[in-house]
Amino acid sequence: MDPQVAFFIAQGISVITGIMAIVMMQLKSMRVILIFQILTNLFASSSYLFLDGKSGMLVSLLAVVCSVVMYFYNTKNRKPHLLVAALFIAAYVASAVYSTVTSNDPWELLPAFAATCFVLSLIQTKASYFRIFATLNPVFWLPYDLHTASYVMFIVHFGILVSSVIGMIRLDGLFRKKK
């Protein structure tokens, strides 16, 4: 495929991802948040695929699997075992190391750090705790997005960061004075 066409397709997919991700940070139900996580990560993996961001694509696909697993735990009103979280984190690190070695690009490690924050956000049972860890996730994605020329995903991740903070203020009472 022509690189310019792939670039524009990726940016278009990223716009859809961004809208969904920003809305997701304002949701109260962890179950609905997990459904949005599945969808946004499917779109994000497609975007990174078109931009040849191997690690970003792998991490996003693993995030889909992780979100599905966490969704089933949530539907049973059970907290996931820490072993499940540790396995996903190990898979993220392995995918990042693989991508880094095959591409000889240390930037490919950043998605693994973002994914660790992602897993820590998903093992939370309350949406307020989810938002705390979800706020850290874009901090690692932002430089990776610039490196892979995923400019719309950069805007998406910046929007997620801002929306997370707004959600923490609006829904979780961040900065409210205690009476």
Kindly label every feature range from the protein language model.
Residues 1-179:
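Alpha-helical membrane-protein topology signature
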